[in-house]
From Swiss-Prot:
This is Probable ethanolamine permease EutH. Pathway: Amine and polyamine degradation; ethanolamine degradation. Keywords: Cell inner membrane, Cell membrane, Membrane, Transmembrane, Transmembrane helix, Transport. Belongs to the EutH family. Probably involved in the diffusion of protonated ethanolamine (EA) into the cell at low pH. At low pH most EA is protonated, and this permease becomes necessary. It comes from Escherichia coli (strain K12). The gene is eutH. GO terms for cellular component: plasma membrane. It is a multi-pass membrane protein. NCBIfam families: PRK15086.1-1.
Length: 408
């Protein structure tokens, strides 16, 4: 049994615990029947429900872009392919740079990869779980949640996170190379050359984004927000066209992928968008309760991380929450000290969703890549913390130290 299978078994263990809690909550609660242990698992049933209800949000984000993937590859290919080949990289890296793995990046990467499975997985699942989500999701969502005065800390944190994405990608690629990833019994050939050469365009983009966030942060952040709005419009167009094609047979956009199983598809080998979403939700039934219960059971050691990083408990809790979803963390930012704000935003660039949606997506689509993806995301997040600690303005760092001393 490999590490990827072990991770799946652990999540299913937590899924069963959460299912028990949901059942017992109908009759007075887990504590009533299971005593102290029951009290420790209360609330996991609610996370069980959250995991399944995520299907709707996932569908809105994924289905349209998944259907559009071959169309976008056909339109963008003539421009993207020559540029990336000139840099010595596979064109699939374009997809993971701009799109999250679960917002079309994985499927567009496959279309652009030209049959190179390793490059497809490297972009679609490793890069596409770090840079893509930051640009199309995290920054636009954060702007709608955080206080306007915290935008400068968001920019600093994202800057720290972006520049360490290549480190996380290389780490994930090396784990994939040494763990012997296989698809349908066939080995996927990750090589040093592939891992390093495909980082060239990523490093260029990371440097440009970092320079923009350093010198024109407001304009860069607003630019990401505008890009995200256009992306939502494109995804909605694709979703509407795909549904019309499925229900009426009208092909409003030629070349769309089916969103349900089509004639010729082999069950278990080919999964279309709707089935993929269902599979992700099944994984999230266990992933969400797992994060809740591990956070509760290991609260003291997790909170001690905050002391090591010299930030308050709210900031430490935000980092833990980020591993499942970064939206709660952004909601907590106004209660964090300055150092904690920058560190959390930096950590979220790579590490967000590592034990949430991205874990569910990898498990549903390519479970051989679960461990490489998680390792890459965590190393990217941890190294981003180191950079963030150097970027906190001196006057703010002094204020943070005073706040930390007051807490203790």
């Amino acid at each position: 049994m490999g590490i990827n299978e072990i991770i799946m078994y652990i999540m299913m263990f937590f899924m069963l615990i959460a299912a028990v809690d949901r059942i017992l909550s109908q009759f007075g609660g887990s504590a009533r029947f299971l005593g102290k242990f029951g009290k420790s698992i209360e609330g996991s049933g609610g996370q069980f429900e959250e995991g399944f209800m995520a299907m709707g949000a996932l569908g809105l984000a994924m289905v349209g872009m998944t259907a559009l993937a071959p169309v976008l590859a056909h339109v963008l290919g003539p421009v993207i392919i020559p540029v990336y080949e000139m840099l010595g990289a596979n064109p699939s890296m374009f997809a993971g740079t701009l799109l999250a793995c679960d917002m079309g990046g994985f499927f567009l990467a496959k279309e652009l990869a030209g049959g190179d499975v390793a490059a497809w997985l490297y972009s679609g699942l490793i890069l596409g779980s770090m840079m893509g989500p930051t640009i199309v999701f995290s920054i636009p969502v954060a702007l709608g949640i955080i206080e306007p005065s915290d935008r400068r800390y968001l920019a600093l944190g994202v800057l720290a996170g972006i520049v360490t994405i290549p480190i996380g990608c290389i780490a994930g690629g090396l784990v994939a190379m040494y763990s012997g990833v296989q698809i349908n019994g066939q080995p996927v050939e990750f090589t040093f050359a592939l891992i390093l050469m495909n980082m060239i365009p990523v490093i260029i983009v990371a440097i440009l984004v970092a320079l923009g966030l350093k010198f024109i942060p407001e304009k860069m952040i607003n630019g990401f927000q505008i890009f995200a709005k256009f992306l939502v419009a494109l995804i909605t167009l694709g979703l509407a066209a795909a549904v019309v094609k499925f229900l009426l047979g009208w092909e409003l956009i030629p070349g769309l992928d089916p969103i349900f199983m089509a004639p010729g598809d082999k069950p278990g080998e080919v999964m279309r968008a709707i089935e993929v979403i269902g599979s992700i939700s099944c994984v999230l039934l266990g992933a969400y309760p797992m994060v809740l219960l591990l956070t509760r059971w290991f609260e003291k050691p997790l909170m001690s991380v905050g002391k090591v990083l010299n930030m308050n408990n709210i900031a430490a809790a935000g980092m833990v929450a980020t591993l499942a979803n970064n939206i709660p963390m952004f909601g907590m930012m106004k209660q964090m000290d300055t150092r904690g704000k920058v560190i959390n935003c930096a950590f979220a660039v790579s590490a967000a969703f590592a034990l949430g949606d991205h874990l569910g997506f990898a498990a549903a689509n390519m479970n051989a890549m679960i461990f490489p993806m998680i390792v890459g995301k965590l190393i990217g997040g941890v190294t981003a913390i180191g950079v963030a600690m150097m970027l906190v303005p001196k006057e703010d760092a002094t204020a943070t130290k005073t706040e930390a001393e007051a807490q203790s």
